[in-house]
Amino acid sequence: MDQTRSLESFLAYVQQRDPHQSEFAQAVREVMTTLWPFLEENPRYRQLSLLERLVEPERVIQFRVTWVDDRNQVQVNRAWRVQFNSAIGPFKGGMRFHPSVNLSILKFLGFEQTFKNALTTLPMGGGKGGSDFDPKGKSEGEVMRFCQALMTELYRHLGPDTDVPAGDIGVGGREVGFMAGMMKKLSNNSACVFTGKGLSFGGSLIRPEATGYGLVYFTEAMLKRHGLGFEGMRVAVSGSGNVAQYAIEKAMQFGARVVTASDSKGTVVDEAGFTAEKLARLCEIKASRDGRLADYAAEFGLTYLEGKQPWGVPVDIALPCATQNELDADAARTLISNGVKAVAEGANMPTTIEATDLFLEAGVLFAPGKAANAGGVATSGLEMAQNAARLGWKAEKVDARLHHIMLDIHHACVEYGGEASQTNYVRGANIAGFVKVADAMIGQGVI
């Protein structure tokens, strides 16, 4: 049976193979829906079972992690590493620690990462990993013991030319350091096998800022192409972690008035807009073990919408930076009715397919995460380059390279998604990333 004779038959094939992996199926549907007209015009990409190979990870590693907590009780977690596609380079993608982590989510993230990494023009394949371990409320000793226990299995599957993980939700510089240290201990090798490391042992300047900065660089390029800009715009940001914090900082530098931030408990609204002082305090509060956005709102006398997302606040630009599927169709309708001009994804797939369709139908500029938030992995690639050369670049050089890469990604999206009146960035990003990966797979034969 030819699964690629139509879009629906191919999506049914994916669903039938993994019927309980809804997040992965959603990611495949989003990509293939925009790709299919291009595939019909270029049938060579449907030969040699290329599409079937593209949606099947090269390797999935699942393992048990046993560790001892502060009460001397043995705890058991599950962990995975999805090595999705290495056609253009070693597997590259973050590690996520969160109770919601499962194989479907990691396959979706690895699939998206494959195209995102291709868009950066750097030689990196796609992968993703993580565990259902929850670092919230854990002591530093517990986090360290978990990371070290995880690496006793994972280390054998990593290497600078094989698989180079990084951080993600629940995995910051501390966790990366613990894992990188244990990797060095077990392998007796100090080669670069993690990015997002501390500056004292091979990290890169601008890496913590890169995803948020890159998001704003891409969004500014998108706005400029359509006669707009951040200057004077009201901006809603969701989330209050790393990506959100640096997106707020860079948007402020571009002249925007950022009026929201959020966490899992609610949203803070600041009609006057963030200032450098307020942002610094937000970062301090969120860095504490039990930091809550409600405390920040109370300190500055701001409105706090408990249990609410930021999408009901009238804004010109929305930057979802929290988690997948946070912006649904109802939220999209509210934003559209309030006159939103642009939406750019700082998180991975934070916008549902229905919401994305509504934005595109309404003529709202929409930047998908695989393009807009590629700055983090792009700077990870720059960190790998610095490690390989045994060099460290100045912050200005890394930032300039990041800005250049984001403009290149924007150019690729326009090349494949350009239209007379408005660029379809979803189509452009999907086709541009697909073509690079597919050409590499075809060139390497059936393997």
Predicted regions: what they are:
Residues 11-12, 29, 33, 103, ...:
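Predominant activation on well-ordered alpha-helical scaffold segments within soluble catalytic domains
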Residues 1-205, 439-445:
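N-terminal ligand-binding/catalytic initiation module
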Residues 266-366, 371:
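Rossmann-like adenosine-cofactor binding region
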